[in-house]
Structure formats: C-alpha cells, structure tokens
Amino acid sequence: MSRTENIEHVEESVESELKQPSMYKVILNNDDYTPMDFVIEILQLFFRKDEAQATEIMLAIHHKGKGICGIYPFGIAETKVAQVNQFARQNEHPLLCSLEEA
C-alpha cells in the first residue's frame, strides 16, 4: 500500500468513527414567584433571544409549565443551566432551569 493510499484509508476510518454529539434541551420551568420580565431578561442574556422570541418562550413557560430555551451539546447545555440557576439565586428568584435529552 502506498503512502497516499494509507493516508486516504486513515481519513476514511476517522470520518466513519465520528458521530454527532447527543443534544440536550435547556428548559425553564414555571413557578408562581419569578416575574415575567425576569424570565425575558434571562432568555435575552443567556440565550440571545430578541424581545419577541423571549416573550413567546416566556408565555409558553407561563401557560404550559415549561419552555425550551435552546438545544445544545451536553457541555454547553450543562453550563447554561448552571449559569441561569446561579443568576436566578443571585437575584433571589426560585426560577429553575433544567436539561433533558433532545
């Protein structure tokens, strides 16, 4: 086998072994105490939603009990959940952010 054929074989092996990472939904859960404006602020600050998108998600959270903020690989989703929960506690709100497999 020539050097070129060997390199091509290795490239094909690597490409066939790679797979997409598992994706996770980052979810905000409704509660009776967190103000709607604070939920909108969270969505804009941590998930880069514009005001219209943030309002739509906030209303889904309010009416359905939870809303999806975004779908990310596990590491990113886990970080966002931790950041949101920490920010909510710092601002004395019981808002709960969680993740589930997409």
UniProtKB/Swiss-Prot annotation:
Q: PANTHER family, alphabetically?
A: ATP-DEPENDENT CLP PROTEASE ADAPTER PROTEIN CLPS, ATP-DEPENDENT CLP PROTEASE ADAPTER PROTEIN CLPS1, CHLOROPLASTIC
Function summary: Involved in the modulation of the specificity of the ClpAP-mediated ATP-dependent protein degradation.
Q: Which residues form the signal peptide?
A: none
Family note: Belongs to the ClpS family.
- One of its Pfam families is ClpS
Protein name, UniProt field:
ATP-dependent Clp protease adapter protein ClpS
Coiled coil start-end: none
Question: Which gene is annotated as encoding this protein in its UniProt record?
Answer: clpS
Gene3D superfamilies assigned: 3.30.1390.10
Q: Which domain of life is it from?
A: Bacteria
